[in-house]
């Protein structure tokens, strides 16, 4: 869980920008999107092999 404390004399937009940056660095949002729906292990393996095949080319 990312936590951002609004500093003294800091605008809300700046604090929101810092929060978004920290969330993207930790990969929290990507992880949540990945786990939003259950994915069978066979589908995970298939996606993993397809990604490896794409990287190879």
From Swiss-Prot:
GO terms classed as biological process: translation
Cross-referenced Pfam families: Ribosomal_S21
Top-level taxon: Bacteria
Record keywords, A-Z: Ribonucleoprotein, Ribosomal protein
Single GO cellular component term: ribosome
GO molecular function, one term: structural constituent of ribosome
Keyword Oxidoreductase: no
PROSITE patterns reported for this sequence: RIBOSOMAL_S21 (PS01181)
InterPro entries recorded: Ribosomal_bS21, Ribosomal_bS21_CS, Ribosomal_bS21_sf
KW Coiled coil (keyword) present: no
Family in the record: Belongs to the bacterial ribosomal protein bS21 family.
Record-linked HAMAP family: Ribosomal_bS21
NCBIfam families (alphabetical): S21p
Protein name as it appears in the record: Small ribosomal subunit protein bS21
């Amino acid at each position: 869980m990312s936590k951002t404390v609004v500093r003294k004399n800091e605008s809300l937009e700046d604090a929101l920008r810092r929060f978004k940056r920290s969330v993207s660095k930790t990969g929290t949002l990507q992880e949540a999107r990945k786990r939003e729906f259950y994915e069978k292990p066979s589908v995970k393996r298939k996606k993993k092999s397809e990604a490896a095949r794409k990287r190879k080319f």
